[in-house]
């Protein structure tokens, strides 16, 4: 008899976690499981991945677009004490609505064998749900919580509510077990799955490019792909490294694909470092893979990461990956520097030196390209989904 499984997550907006969720839903064996999807937020037009949910999966939203919009109205003004109180009341209302709607969904679906809390967002009420087994996925490093003892304790208590905890790389698994020794035996490592067949098709698809973009593809450029958010992504270090290279007479072009709240700050840095003729912000691209395929190499400058999906995608495209040595994620993917180049977070001199080495040493470049292409085979969804399914079957 097939197990009935609910996957739950926060939204269907554009994001790495959401992309992984869709990949899981599209590739999990429906002969083994009856799959249902529960999403917290109905974001209307921002439900980018709603169209990609498999047709044979029923899905539900816990919060309406209207309720979310009403709460957001007060969030923007919560510096004012009155609005802050109203915002807190609205958040309490949202939590009540979510719990009530979840209970109604469970009543409609009948007995559920497993819930997969894909982003940990159900931890406030998970123990109240009449579901046999509960699994939580952890997608981000918890090292940034270490200095906040209260948050560390609260996070540990949340994890204790689940029967299984899944970390997306070995370093993250070790991190969780070291901070929370009582969880040893409950933590598994399962990589994020990648549909390389789909990526291969997109790498060769130039159908939606303009004439100007096709000309840009023919340039000699390296590439960075990430959200324009300087809280997590270390664009200052990245741009400073190109300033150093320019001072040495090395004029390497850099295309940056992505959008986000820090776009203006990054534009100001480009002007300040006089890189207007070398660094180009291309915005969000529906198909970044064709740009990856035609690039010289890939750079990822970040202060911290969860897994770093784009590093695997860059590796599959056969490009050298140069990345920050974040606490988790890139080190695991690049096998601590065996399959790519790592530099210390915030060290623009080291990054500039590494870029120069790759530009000047073609033998080294070819060796890294070969090694990373082989390494990323481990993340193929055909292999990873066997681990997903085994975990759900055996819990």
What are the roles of these predicted feature ranges?
Residues 335-337, 341-348, 357-363:
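Conserved acidic donor-binding segment of nucleotide-sugar-dependent glycosyltransferases
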Residues 124-126, 162-187, 194:
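A short, active-site helix/loop in glycosyltransferases that binds the activated sugar's phosphate group
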Residues 146-148, 174-178, 186, 193-217:
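Acidic anion/phosphate-binding donor-loop and adjacent secondary structure
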Residues 284, 303:
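Aromatic "clamp/platform" in nucleotide-sugar-dependent glycosyltransferases that forms part
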Residues 320-324:
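Short hydrophobic beta-strand element within catalytic cores of glycosyltransferases
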Residues 350, 357, 364-381, 386-390:
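A short, well-ordered alpha-helix in the C-terminal region of glycosyltransferases
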Residues 7-14, 27, 31-89, 172, ...:
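N-terminal strand-loop element at the rim of the active site
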Residues 15-23, 220, 224-244, 261-267, ...:
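A conserved mid-protein helix/loop that constitutes part of the nucleotide-sugar donor-binding site
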């Amino acid at each position: 008899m097939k197990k009935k499984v609910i996957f739950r997550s926060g939204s269907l907006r554009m994001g790495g976690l959401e992309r992984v969720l869709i990949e899981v839903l599209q590739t999990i064996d429906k002969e083994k499981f009856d799959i249902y999807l529960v999403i917290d937020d109905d974001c209307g037009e921002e439900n980018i991945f709603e169209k990609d949910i498999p047709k044979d999966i029923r899905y539900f939203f816990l919060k309406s677009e209207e309720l979310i919009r009403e709460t957001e109205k007060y969030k923007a003004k919560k510096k004012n004490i009155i609005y802050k109180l109203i915002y807190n009341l609205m958040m309490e209302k949202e939590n009540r609505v979510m719990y009530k709607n979840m209970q109604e969904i469970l009543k409609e679906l009948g007995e559920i064998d497993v819930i997969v809390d894909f982003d940990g967002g159900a931890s406030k009420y998970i123990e109240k749900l009449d579901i046999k087994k509960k699994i939580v996925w952890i997608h981000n490093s918890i090292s940034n919580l270490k200095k906040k003892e209260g948050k560390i304790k609260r996070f540990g208590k949340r994890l204790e509510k689940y029967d299984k905890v899944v970390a997306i790389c070995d370093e993250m698994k070790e991190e969780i077990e070291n901070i929370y020794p009582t969880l040893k035996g409950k933590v598994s490592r399962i990589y994020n799955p990648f549909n390389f067949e789909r990526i291969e098709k997109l790498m060769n698809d130039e159908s939606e490019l303009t004439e100007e973009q096709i000309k840009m593809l023919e340039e000699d450029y390296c590439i960075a792909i990430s959200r324009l958010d300087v809280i997590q992504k270390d664009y200052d270090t990245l741009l400073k490294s190109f300033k150093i290279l320019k001072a040495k007479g090395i004029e390497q072009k850099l295309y940056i694909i992505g959008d986000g709240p820090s776009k203006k700050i990054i534009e100001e840095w480009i002007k300040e470092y006089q890189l207007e003729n070398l660094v180009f912000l291309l915005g969000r691209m529906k198909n970044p893979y064709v740009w990856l395929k035609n690039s010289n190499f890939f750079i990822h400058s970040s202060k911290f990461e969860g897994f770093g999906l784009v590093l695997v995608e860059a590796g599959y495209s056969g490009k050298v990956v140069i990345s920050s040595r974040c606490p988790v994620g890139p080190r695991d993917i690049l096998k601590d520097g065996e399959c790519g180049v790592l530099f210390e977070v915030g060290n623009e001199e080291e990054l500039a030196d590494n870029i120069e080495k790759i530009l000047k040493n073609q033998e080294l470049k070819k060796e890294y390209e070969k090694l990373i292409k082989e390494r990323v085979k481990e993340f193929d969804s055909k292999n990873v989904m066997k681990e997903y399914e085994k975990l759900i079957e055996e819990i």
